[in-house]
Amino acid sequence: MDVQPARTMRNLPDTLSSLMGFNKHLTPSWIESVSHIIDGLSPTKPQMKVMVEKDENISDDNTESEAKVQKIQDELVSLNAQLKQITLQRREALNNYLDLKGNIRVFCRIRPFHHEESYSSRNLFTLDESNVFLKVAETKRKQYKFDKVFDQFSTQGDVFSEVEPVIKSALDGYNVCIFAYGQTGSGKTYTMEGKPTNLGVIPRGIQTLFNQASECNNRFLFTFSMLEIYMGNIRDLLAPRSKTNGIKNVPSLSIKSDPDGGIEIEDLVAVTVNSFQEVKRLYEMGTRLRSTASTMANSTSSRSHCLIRISLTSLNATERRKATSKLWMIDLGGSERLVKTKATGKRLKEGKAINLSLSALGDVIDALQTKKPHVPYRNSKLTQVLRDSLGCESKTLMLVHISPDEGDLCETICTLGFATRVRSIRLESEEPPEMKARKETLLIDLGQKVNDLEHECEDIRRKIKNLEESMEHLTGPQPTIYSNFDMSHLSSEELKTDVSSNVRNSKNRREASSRLPRFMKPTASSQHRIGLNNRTPIINRLKPPVPPRRRPSSVYAESVMVPVNAAPWQSECSSECSMSLTSDMNWTPSIRDGTECSQDASEYEIKQVIFSEHEKSSHDQVTCYTDYPLAESRDIQIKIEEKGIVDIDNWLHQQIVEKTSTFRSKMVLDIPGVTEAEIHVSSIPSPTTMACTKEDSQVKDEVMGLTLQSSTDYVEDIKQSKTDNQFTAKELCTPPFKEFSSNNEVKGHKNEHPVYHGRPRRSLQEELENCTLEKPNMDSKSHRSHDDKHKTGKFTKFFQALQTAWIGALLALGTVSIGLEHGFFQSLTL
């Protein structure tokens, strides 16, 4: 500290004395108070000496601490530069390692036997590290080659050890795709989700992403999206619900290309996430909305492809390949054939759509493997969505699952054939043994180099952390702009004033690039097919004026959070707990429509949301170890506004809880409450639920408990018609008319059931004025036959007589033809 402040304190009495000369015209009390202040500030000579010594000591200490701080800062700058260089080397080594293994790799996993399956089945497979030998006959075997084979005793950790390097490359700026392929019941969902005690690829991969990002010196923005492709339509599983459209009116999201050549899905919800628990919560919400149905292969078969996208954005990171990368984890639909499912109707169409998209995926991967000039991305919505994540420098993994059961042999052969096609194995492409040995040696060296560089990065990060703690001890805690990448802590008011012009320019560029020529615009038929004619494009949609108050929350509907019996990552969760989050009161569910569709709405708005504070654990949040300038924060804010990224809490809180209930995973609308007055007005006894009592000869409704006043004649007529079985319930009576004397009488007898006066009719042919309620004196049968006789015409009588004569002639001819003549019948009478 400089000695200037101490000198100023010593000169303060003289300064105040000089000021008194300019203020003599003021009151004497002010002059007296200033004099007391001067006396208090005037130190004695010993006190002055002590103060000077203290000032000199403080100045020396501050000079020494400033030197230490400067030294620590220089070391931090050097270590950060060294860490950036080593991180770049690690990225290049890992990329070379994966390129040497192959950008498109295919693994095979054989699930173990179920308890209900026969263990006495003959062994179909003979395995080694990279080959599957299938025994198709007693003396015939067929070989299938893979990059890695996992037997029936392999664990989830064994599978993830091969997947982990690919997931790490997503942090380096590369797009990654991980597929799970196989027939229904072969273990796809178990490999991807796992169980709470044995997590699968999806939860392990997400945990790895957050752990690696927390150890990195860069800040990352993670966004989570979840969608399904059902019968060629793209459906957002995280879109806010709307009760204006039913399940059958859900439109398909459209696919667009951005100026950088990437693929963007229009109106797809992207939610910012900061921890594994937030991703887990969103994943559980999305899996309950998947389209599932019962087939011969599985009672809860998925009827669509489920795609999970995690986008990673890190600006000003020179060691990354791209600023934004994508990690796709896809649970494909079952690849079983029609012979296996025996599906008809809608299930048949769903199976066709799944197999067509799987075939298109095989064509694309085969074209990429063989480096064909044309790659057929446009043959399927699945390949269109993944276009920027399959080719170029992207990393792709295909996990093929097969069943050991002998009953699934045909499906196993088809699955292995698809895997062989994806790997593009050719006889002439087999490498010589010397080349294979050299490749294996190089892989081992690169793997060891990657591990060494990772350990070196960890040591440097540890040193940086210790130096930062030392600096904090010397200078105290320094306020930073951001301590994590949670976008909810952004100072939006400051950023709006600084970057409004940049955001406006970026929006204008995006709108200009989204305009299509006339010949490229969709036709009316295509818009009707994908459901675009029911909504207005976002670029042409006018924003409503901002109301003074918040918009009523009845615009959107949210799900009822039903308790899930199964564990969150258990494979059965996606089928048993699947339900529709909202209900449309105008939609009537059909019996034939057995598929549980994932969406009830098409129109929704981009919203900003976040998790509750108690769910944000500090150890799960990714923190940065260096202070970043405000320019990077502005760039991230611009990136968020350009892509329409939303936060998770506001998005969840702005939805409305709609009352829905489920019955066997089917959507059932809640029965609206009915008042007692409405019951009196609208209750009509059903003709099929009437019961007669012998004591009072009254007709009662079994369901409503309503009494019908009817005469004894009519009650006996009902009993007689039951014995004769000639009249139906529809012919006997019609819904009675309600006769009230006045509305006041109804209000006065609310606690009593109203009395209904029945007006019966005997048949539909009788006229109303000829009906009588008097008890007939003759037998009912003769009475009805007499009426029928009067109603019979001459033509009817003639036709009956002719029919009788014709039958008699036929009988006579028949007896003569078999030798039974007049003598035979005469002998019978003797």
UniProtKB/Swiss-Prot annotation:
MF terms (GO), sorted A to Z: ATP binding; ATP hydrolysis activity; microtubule binding; microtubule motor activity
Q: Which residues form a coiled coil?
A: 56-97, 434-476
Q: Which PROSITE patterns match?
A: KINESIN_MOTOR_2
Q: Where is the Kinesin motor domain?
A: 103-425
The domain of life for this entry's organism is Eukaryota
GO CC term, one of those recorded? kinesin complex
Keywords of the record, alphabetical order, are: ATP-binding, Coiled coil, Microtubule, Motor protein, Nucleotide-binding
InterPro entries, A to Z: Kinesin-like_fam, Kinesin_motor_dom, Kinesin_motor_dom_sf, P-loop_NTPase
Q: Name one GO biological process term.
A: microtubule-based movement
The record's listing under Pfam families reads: Kinesin (PF00225)
Name the positions where ATP binds.
Answer: 182-189
Would you identify the family this protein belongs to, as annotated? Belongs to the TRAFAC class myosin-kinesin ATPase superfamily. Kinesin family. KIN-14 subfamily.
Name of this chain's protein: Kinesin-like protein KIN-14B
Gene that specifies this protein: KIN14B
